[in-house]
A protein has these predicted regions:
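Charge-rich, low-complexity N-terminal segments
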Residues: 1-147
């Protein structure tokens, strides 16, 4: 029996300190760990990062998403973790990725930085759907460009 799918969208502040190489090394560790653990937990998703913030979409069974998110909340590389949405979903939008990534040099990340600046990191002004749509649009574009 298939468990119902859920989608969680959150943002957090980046607490990784150091030069660009140090920060990118930490991001690589996050991605490597996620790409190993997420398929085992039946989680797919996407991470977006710029120097100041993370945004992430996680898709999968409710309890698995919740367990993964609890680990994220305890990770010292994140602070001010805010859930923008956590809802049932009919299908996965990031099924091809255990953890897709849009880095600080991407167009999406620049737009994300603008959204975060515009909102003043105020969760009341941010919408999970806006972050989700931004990630989806740019990952699908990147995927089609790589074909």
């Amino acid at each position: 029996m298939n468990e119902p799918l859920y989608r969680l969208v959150y943002i957090s502040r980046n607490e990784i300190k150091g030069d660009d190489a140090t920060v990118l090394g930490e991001i690589d560790q996050i991605l490597a760990s996620s790409r190993i653990k997420n398929p085992i937990a039946n989680i797919s998703g996407a991470l977006m990062f710029n120097a100041g913030c993370f945004a992430q979409v996680l898709e999968g069974p409710h309890d698995d998403i919740q367990n993964c998110f609890e680990r994220i909340q305890c990770d010292p590389r994140h602070s001010h973790v805010v859930v923008l949405s956590f809802e049932p979903t009919a299908k996965r939008e990031f099924s091809n990725w255990s953890m897709a990534y849009l880095g600080a040099d991407s167009t999406a990340s620049a737009k994300f930085g603008g959204i975060m600046h515009e909102s003043g990191f105020d969760a009341e002004l941010l919408k999970g759907e806006r972050i989700f749509d931004l990630l989806k649009e740019h990952l699908l574009e990147a995927e089609s460009n790589s074909l």
